Amino acid sequence: MRCPTCKYNGTRVVDSRPADDGNSIRRRRECEKCGFRFTTFEKVEESPLIVVKKDGAREEFAREKVRRGLIRACEKRPVSAEQIEEIVNEVERELRNIGDSEIASDLIGEKVMNKLASLDEVAYVRFASVYRQFKDISVFVEELKDLMEKNKDR
């Protein structure tokens, strides 16, 4: 690996340990020429997930889009950035575990809604109203009734 300071091509690994819950390896390296120490991360390159949209268009899965939707739904709610990030991680992990390279956008939305329903009901309703594109108040009220019915069962 090339030294970021002197650009010499010879470095040695000083320390190596798992990082990111075992999903990557953190390595401390030292340049053999100038002695500069730096950190690198080694991670498995995963094949891209392709999202098949409702109109049939295909695009690469973007964690940032899921995160933005969650942030918007959770505005002014007692939901932390860590909780939002955990939902993004869980959704991506579940999608990858399916084993298909193409995933329907509906499945992503449903997974996010299921996670939000157990975390914060107001955020769930906000997300559902955008995701399901409620056309009028009656559809919105039906969704609220369903949510209240589910809560009675708990």
UniProtKB/Swiss-Prot annotation:
Q: Which GO terms describe its biological process?
A: negative regulation of DNA-templated transcription
Q: Which UniProt keywords apply?
A: ATP-binding, DNA-binding, Metal-binding, Nucleotide-binding, Repressor, Transcription, Transcription regulation, Zinc, Zinc-finger
* Record's keyword annotation contains Transcription: yes
Query: What InterPro entries does the annotation carry?
Result: ATP-cone_dom, NrdR-like_N, RNR_NrdR-like
DNA-binding among keywords: yes
Query: What cofactor is this protein dependent on?
Result: Zn(2+)
Q: Which domain of life is it from?
A: Bacteria
**Boundaries of every ATP-cone domain copy:** 49-139
Cofactor remark from the record: Binds 1 zinc ion.
Q: Which sequence ranges are marked TM in the entry?
A: none
Q: What does it do?
A: Negatively regulates transcription of bacterial ribonucleotide reductase nrd genes and operons by binding to NrdR-boxes.
What is the similarity comment for this entry?
A: Belongs to the NrdR family.
Tell me the HAMAP family matching this sequence.
NrdR (MF_00440)
**Name used for this protein in its record:** Transcriptional repressor NrdR
Q: Which gene encodes it?
A: nrdR
